[in-house]
From Swiss-Prot:
<feature type="domain" description="Lipoyl-binding">
    <location>
        <begin position="16"/>
        <end position="98"/>
    </location>
</feature>
<comment type="similarity">
    <text>Belongs to the GcvH family.</text>
</comment>
<comment type="function">
    <text>The glycine cleavage system catalyzes the degradation of glycine. The H protein shuttles the methylamine group of glycine from the P protein to the T protein.</text>
</comment>
<dbReference type="GO" id="GO:0019464">
    <property type="term" value="P:glycine decarboxylation via glycine cleavage system"/>
</dbReference>
<dbReference type="Pfam" id="PF01597">
    <property type="entry name" value="GCV_H"/>
</dbReference>
<dbReference type="InterPro" id="IPR011053">
    <property type="entry name" value="Single_hybrid_motif"/>
</dbReference>
<dbReference type="InterPro" id="IPR002930">
    <property type="entry name" value="GCV_H"/>
</dbReference>
<comment type="subunit">
    <text>The glycine cleavage system is composed of four proteins: P, T, L and H.</text>
</comment>
<protein>
    <recommendedName>
        <fullName>Glycine cleavage system H protein</fullName>
    </recommendedName>
</protein>
<feature type="modified residue" description="N6-lipoyllysine">
    <location>
        <position position="57"/>
    </location>
</feature>
<dbReference type="InterPro" id="IPR033753">
    <property type="entry name" value="GCV_H/Fam206"/>
</dbReference>
<dbReference type="GO" id="GO:0005737">
    <property type="term" value="C:cytoplasm"/>
</dbReference>
<dbReference type="GO" id="GO:0005960">
    <property type="term" value="C:glycine cleavage complex"/>
</dbReference>
<dbReference type="InterPro" id="IPR000089">
    <property type="entry name" value="Biotin_lipoyl"/>
</dbReference>
<dbReference type="InterPro" id="IPR003016">
    <property type="entry name" value="2-oxoA_DH_lipoyl-BS"/>
</dbReference>
<keyword id="KW-0450">Lipoyl</keyword>
<dbReference type="InterPro" id="IPR017453">
    <property type="entry name" value="GCV_H_sub"/>
</dbReference>
Amino acid sequence: MRFTKDHEWVALDGDVATIGITAHAAEQLGDVVFVEVPEVGRQVKAGDAFAVVESVKAASDVYAPVTGEVVEANEALSGAPETVNAEPEAGGWFAKVRVADPAELDGLMDKAAYDAFVANS
């Protein structure tokens, strides 16, 4: 699993990346009440907002950490947004993206680097 400075996580399986927000991000947001996931077939670019998460505290964009095509969206989140709080780095994933350039993941942090980033923020 790799992590971004915007608190997204990426798990790569072959050429498909599963993307969600980190446990730290979910904790900071508080109780998630709404999630908008991207449409399947949508082309996304690394750094672009591609999903929205709203909590009792705030609304936040979720940024695509990689460039590619959305091949699956976690539609279950629309009926159960609290899954993002309960399982942020598992069942609370937002989308799966077929990665155009796997080298983009090289610039992301591993768990130890992300934990240090959060601790120093």
